[in-house]
């Protein structure tokens, strides 16, 4: 069965990252468990590389752009991220859930998934993981978590 990096990340997030009740096992234990769960060593390594890239983003300086700056997507990004996904990212930025640095990190992490098709659910999960990893984003994380799991928010265009 072909698994994706994204499925490994979802497994880790649901079972360990978002669970504050239990201490997190070490990386070797996680790799063994993921292998036993049916993920390939290559996918496991790529998922940990993805998480390392997310963790490394905490040390990157934020770039400042003007208030009226418009994000223009590169051709590779428009191929991978459909109009609905890009529109949702814009909505999150306009709603104050993502700032510019958060938006760029979400786009970076979506591109790092190496999946050809990035759908709206994938975008929502990646936004949730990015917000979870960013200090001071608890309220935005809770909002995204409600949106992802409860789906109470109706977007009006």
Swiss-Prot record:
Domain of life: Bacteria
A Pfam family per the record: DUF494
Transmembrane segments: none
Family the entry assigns: Belongs to the Smg family.
Protein name: Protein Smg homolog
Species of origin: Alkalilimnicola ehrlichii (strain ATCC BAA-1101 / DSM 17681 / MLHE-1)
């Amino acid at each position: 069965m072909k698994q994706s990096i994204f499925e490994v990340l979802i497994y880790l997030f649901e079972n360990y990252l978002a669970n504050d009740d239990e201490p997190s096992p070490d990386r070797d234990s996680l790799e063994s468990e993921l292998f036993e769960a049916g993920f390939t060593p290559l996918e496991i390594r790529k998922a940990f590389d993805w998480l390392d890239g997310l963790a490394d983003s905490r040390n990157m300086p934020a770039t400042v752009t003007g208030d009226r700056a418009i994000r223009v997507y590169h051709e590779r990004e428009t191929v991978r991220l459909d109009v609905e996904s890009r529109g949702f990212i814009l909505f999150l930025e306009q709603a104050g859930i993502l700032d510019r640095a958060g938006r760029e990190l979400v786009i970076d992490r979506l591109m790092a998934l190496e999946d050809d098709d990035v759908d709206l659910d994938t975008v929502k999960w990646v936004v949730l993981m990015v917000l979870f990893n960013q200090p001071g984003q608890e309220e935005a994380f809770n909002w995204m978590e409600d949106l992802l799991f409860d789906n109470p928010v109706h977007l009006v265009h």
